[in-house]
């Protein structure tokens, strides 16, 4: 089965991450999906932006015009991203914080069919809410939380996340590639959870994971490299 290749925040080696230009380039480079982050502004707009704050001011406390002014960028709204990508590529939409799960999914469903996007998050509760209200939406738990308050407890819950996954009824898991140890992939297979690994940028690792039948897909900043390696791998397998 062909691995799914997901452009991490668009083609960010060509254009600034999470911009319309980066997303357009990812489409042209034949990515299968685009991954991006969604937050809500003070004036209730959904914007595509990774960081929690700008100049120490939380995104949730800023209006849209201020965000663009502070970043010196045309930060895209979710509406703009969907209009650009609709019918051209599927979306991997990461919800960054709690409190607007139902609103954002309802908004997305105004434009997209249920099979045209997935929702991912580090936050168990957000995914639980979405699955309860929208059972047909595919959800995925992201593992590999940066700078956790309790590193040991957090890492153990990420290396052995399957009880969490059952509780919130996710469809797949998205571990950081460094978590693929101590039998992680074997356990995921036992629990019948597809694995989408992030963020895989080294050519050696991309090749390794493309060849691993236990991995369903890769999230990468190097989408052009990954697409080419996948094509080469498929040609190799067609040779007599």
List each language-model region with its residue ranges.
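Phosphate-group recognition and catalysis centered on beta-loop-alpha active-site segments
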Residues: 1-240
């Amino acid at each position: 089965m062909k691995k799914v290749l997901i452009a991490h925040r668009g083609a960010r080696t060509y254009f600034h991450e999470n911009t319309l230009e980066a997303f357009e380039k990812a489409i042209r480079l034949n990515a299968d999906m685009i991954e991006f982050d969604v937050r809500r502004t003070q004036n209730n707009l959904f914007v595509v932006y990774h960081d929690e704050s700008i100049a120490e001011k939380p995104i949730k406390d800023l209006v849209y015009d201020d965000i663009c002014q502070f970043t010196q960028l045309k930060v895209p709204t979710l509406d703009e991203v969907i209009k650009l990508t609709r019918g051209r590529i599927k979306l991997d939409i990461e919800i960054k914080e709690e409190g607007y799960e139902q609103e954002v999914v309802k908004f997305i469903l105004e434009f997209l069919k249920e099979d045209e996007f997935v929702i991912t998050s580090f936050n168990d509760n957000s995914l639980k809410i979405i699955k309860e209200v929208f059972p047909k939406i595919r959800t995925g738990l992201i593992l590999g939380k940066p700078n956790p308050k309790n590193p040991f407890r957090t890492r153990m819950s990420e290396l052995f996340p399957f009880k969490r996954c059952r509780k919130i009824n996710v469809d797949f898991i998205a571990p950081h590639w460094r978590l693929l140890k101590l039998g992680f992939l074997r356990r995921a297979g036992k629990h019948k959870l597809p694995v989408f690994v992030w963020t895989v940028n080294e050519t050696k690792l991309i090749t390794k994971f493309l060849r691993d039948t236990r991995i369903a897909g890769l999230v990468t900043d190097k989408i052009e490299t990954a697409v080419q390696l996948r094509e080469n791998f498929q040609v190799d397998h067609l040779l007599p």
